[in-house]
């Protein structure tokens, strides 16, 4: 499916085929970077689709197109074969139309992969849940900035969990306000390192007979991906 090149973008405008149209309103963007995966899932072209999520590349287009988008916990799904963007936060996840379908997909794609040393053999084994559950509701995620419908749905489900006998407590994560700043320190540094091999300057294939730096980048990539 169409996506922003190297997962860099939030609209699929930085792609080989131009921006993907939103599944509900073609005048709007589908989101990104995995916008194409969200759209084909929303339009029932496929029962599910995969994507990568570093800083919202599954969750944002899923939200824009009204489907379920899951970024699994780091180490749950192998990243083998994925062109790394920022290795500390890159995760493979899925798009589906229901939460139940997302569970089925995650059961298939999760697990140990000897080609990815960050994966665990059975992610769910050490986290067997005892009933009743104790669930934290993050206060910083329930501010006035949250869409009222999303906030209402979350609080409604929290009450449903309480009625089922589970404990739901408000939990404060004061450092949450700093996460975006930390993201923009860590991710650009890792992107610079991971993608250095593709510019044809220091590592990898280097095109010849070039006149400008932009031409060096373009020809090196063209020759390397043929």
Q: Can you name each region flagged by the protein language model?
A:
Residues 167-172:
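General small-molecule cofactor/ligand-binding pocket signal
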Residues 164:
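Conserved dinucleotide-binding and phosphotransfer motif residues
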Residues 1-107:
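Short glycine/serine-rich loop segments
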Residues 129-136, 189-226:
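Short helix-loop capping/hinge segments that flank enzyme active sites or metal/cofactor-binding pockets
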Residues 68-157, 210-219:
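A short helix-breaking turn/cap at a secondary-structure junction
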Residues 11-18, 181-194:
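Charged, often glycine-rich, active-site loop that binds/positions anionic groups
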């Amino acid at each position: 499916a169409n996506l922003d090149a190297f997962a860099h973008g939030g609209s699929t405008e930085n792609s080989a085929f131009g921006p993907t149209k939103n599944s509900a309103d073609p005048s709007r963007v589908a989101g990104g970077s995995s916008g194409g995966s969200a759209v084909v899932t929303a339009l029932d072209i496929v029962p599910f689709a995969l994507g990568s999520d570093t800083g919202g590349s599954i969750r944002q287009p899923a939200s824009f197109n009204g489907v379920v988008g899951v970024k699994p916990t780091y180490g749950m799904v192998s990243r083998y074969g994925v062109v790394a963007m920022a290795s500390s936060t890159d995760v493979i996840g899925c798009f589906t139309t229901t939460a139940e379908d997302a569970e089925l997909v995650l059961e298939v794609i999760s697990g140990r992969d000897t080609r990815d040393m960050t994966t665990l053999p059975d992610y769910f084994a050490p986290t067997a849940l005892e009933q009743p559950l104790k669930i934290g509701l993050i206060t910083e995620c329930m501010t006035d900035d949250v869409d009222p419908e999303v906030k209402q749905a979350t609080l409604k489900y929290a009450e449903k969990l309480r009625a089922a006998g589970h404990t739901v407590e408000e939990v404060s994560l004061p450092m949450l306000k700093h996460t975006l700043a930390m993201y923009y320190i860590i991710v650009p540094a890792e992107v610079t390192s991971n993608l250095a091999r593709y510019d044809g300057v220091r590592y990898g294939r280097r095109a010849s007979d070039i006149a400008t730096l932009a031409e060096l980048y373009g020809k090196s990539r063209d020759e390397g991906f043929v």
